[in-house]
Amino acid sequence: MKETYFRDLLTNDIKESNIILLGIPYDLGCSCGKGASLAPKTIRELSSFLPPFTADGKSLKNNKIYDYNDVSEYSKIEDKFKEILQYDKFNLILGGDHSISIPTQKVFLEYAKKLNKIPVIIHIDAHPDICDFYDGSKYSHACTNMRAIENGYETNNITMVGIRGYEEQEVQYLSNHKELEVYNASYINKNGFGKILESLFNKYKNSENHLIYLSYDIDANDPSFAPGTGTPEAFGLNNIELLNFIKELFINLPIKVMDIVEVSPVLDNNDITSWLALKTIYEILGILSDKNK
């Protein structure tokens, strides 16, 4: 029988929560396969069927999620996210295509600077998303990181993981900005995540000066694990290895915001990709449970 969304984890008291959930059902920044606007609804609905435990049987009931509902108008995303950040919780955003990260990362930058922190982006994706224009727009999902840099993020505090699909303008930009760390999927599939974690830990572990925004595009996973996405790229990342990488980030780094983007239920097969996103969230909740004790 269908239960309430997120079962026992949901609370109507935002002060009681340790996690705030925001849906952004927007996909007008998408260049090809659409449908990501349906992901927040689909993932919430699937959560009704998922007991509050990790894959290892660890209870998640120490977490309380406050659902801030959806904001679907692009022009209203900034104001809505400003409201949420004032509560000083962990923030989980369900997109939407990757263009939704442009306004949320802008607000996060302003938030971090008010706290005298240096804002950091860890970008897990098949694509660098560092085009200046794409399809005639500066607000395409292919332009997310370029807009972040324009808004004030330092290039040496952006790390890209899982990349394997480049536009020519992105290759040119990155060749001129070697301080921006890029880890291709081919490197990871050969060498694993060890050196990436070492680099990130050296820069940000135990740091009181940084605050991290983790942006997870589901197309970082190989399409065999995540077929329901608008711009699938072959030769991607293994879902277990990527999950373990994300878990290590949450265990060791000061992550304040995570978005999960580019899940497209209409392009999916038996909700495989939506389930992957949801199960990833639950594994992260297992780590947040320990931090919330």
Predicted regions and their residues:
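Conserved alpha-helical scaffold segments that buttress catalytic/binding sites
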Residues: 2-293
